[in-house]
Swiss-Prot record:
The gene is aroB. Catalyzes the conversion of 3-deoxy-D-arabino-heptulosonate 7-phosphate (DAHP) to dehydroquinate (DHQ). It catalyses: 7-phospho-2-dehydro-3-deoxy-D-arabino-heptonate = 3-dehydroquinate + phosphate. This is 3-dehydroquinate synthase. Pathway: Metabolic intermediate biosynthesis; chorismate biosynthesis; chorismate from D-erythrose 4-phosphate and phosphoenolpyruvate: step 2/7. HAMAP family: DHQ_synthase. Disulfide bonds: none annotated. GO terms for cellular component: cytoplasm. It comes from Pseudomonas fluorescens (strain SBW25). The lineage of its organism: Bacteria, Pseudomonadati, Pseudomonadota, Gammaproteobacteria, Pseudomonadales. NCBIfam families: aroB. It holds the Pfam family DHQ_synthase. Its main location: cytoplasm.
Length: 366
């Protein structure tokens, strides 16, 4: 087992990474203050792992709230089911909410914990690659709004993150690839040597090699922890973690939440960010193509929805958390391994990126 730390002073917390951690109650006990525990999971994950987690929590009074699965249910109506469960069981301020599932479950359980009686403890137990390397770390919680993704939420840090890498053995290949989009992101924005490592190990990752997966998860979490330590509330450098997300969120919102997985939209959105970075002269065409090749090898889409027009993108991108005083800030690559957040770009460059022939780019060889 490896343990990393998110260093936020009194609100610091560990990230435990390893196989079989669901069966180690001693990792959970130090982070549960009271006797009441509420496990929040979904209809897909609960049949696989809820019983094991319950066994590790045998010393506590535990309830479970099982939600419908999928991004389409990340909304107010589903959030109310969590509050219904907590209130019906008369859980008090010393309850601990545990999120058992992927990013949707973690975001909603964390937001519910932030709101319930003005804040109760929660623990992240992520079961998808995407949630293990990204959404479970850093305290972003929330739900979607019909007009924009993740527009209603709170920064609320967990007490601990417990990453059992064995849960990836039941993850569908499409979901695994979606998680790899966020892994690749770290190489692009802050760790070019990691990008090289990913090029060498992407096949092993897709084949669920536990050694490779543990390394990828550990390096991703370490990268994110460093950024969160420096900028918890995304006033500066943390925004670079959103490479590809402005374009990607536009895809998710326009196509309907859940039609494209988050990681799939991020991959296509990152290709658009690579294209724009190249048009600005910050990276070369060869470097742009290097990123595209890696996304393709990871089994991810590199062509945005062809039915989306420039106007569609701009409409959705105008409702983005990085918009300040009406100006759209984008995360782009100044160099491979170095991202910047900027609103200083010619409008014509953005228009060219939105109208680019991504099908032609997807045909590149090498």
């Amino acid at each position: 087992m490896q343990t990393l730390k998110v260093d936020l002073g009194e609100r610091s917390y560990p990230i435990h990474i390893g196989e079989g951690l669901l069966d180690q109650p001693e990792l959970l006990a130090p982070h549960i203050a009271g006797r009441q525990v509420a496990i929040i999971s979904n209809e897909t994950v609960a049949p696989l792992y809820l019983e094991r987690l319950n066994r590790s929590l045998a010393a506590y009074s535990v309830i479970s709230v099982i939600l419908p699965d999928g991004e389409a249910h990340k909304n107010w109506e589903t959030l109310q089911l969590i509050f219904d469960g907590l209130l019906t069981a008369r859980h008090d301020r010393r309850t601990t909410v545990i999120a058992l599932g992927g990013g949707v479950i973690g975001d909603m359980a964390g937001f519910a914990a932030a709101c319930y009686q003005r804040g109760v403890d929660f623990i992240q137990v992520p079961t998808t690659l995407l949630s293990q390397v990204d959404s479970s770390v850093g305290g972003k919680t929330g739900i979607n709004h019909p007009l924009g993704k993740n527009m209603v939420g709170a920064f609320y840090q967990p007490q601990a993150v417990l990453i059992d890498t064995a849960t990836l053995n039941t993850l569908p290949p499409r979901e695994l690839s979606a998680g790899l989009a966020e892994v690749i992101k770290y190489g692009l924005i802050c760790d070019e040597p990691f990008l090289t490592w990913l090029e060498e190990h992407v096949d092993a990752l897709r084949n669920l090699d536990q050694v490779a997966l543990t390394e990828a998860i550990s390096r991703s979490c370490a990268a994110k922890a460093l950024v969160v330590n420096a900028d918890e509330r995304e006033s500066g450098v943390r925004a670079t973690l959103n490479l590809g997300h402005t374009f990607g969120h536009a895809i998710e919102t326009h196509m309907g939440y859940g039609v494209w997985l988050h990681g799939e939209a991020v991959a296509a959105g990152t290709v658009m960010a690579l294209d724009m970075s190249q048009r600005l002269g910050w990276i070369s065409a060869q470097e742009r193509d290097r990123g595209i090749r890696l996304f393709q090898r990871a089994g991810l889409p590199v062509i945005p929805p062809e039915e989306m027009t420039e106007a569609d993108f701009l409409e959705h991108m105008a409702i983005d958390k990085k918009v300040i005083d009406g100006r759209l800030r984008l995360v782009l690559l100044r160099h491979m391994g170095e991202a910047v957040v900027t609103d200083d770009y010619p409008k014509e460059i953005l228009q060219a990126t939105l109208g680019a022939d991504y099908r032609a780019l997807a045909q590149l060889k090498g």
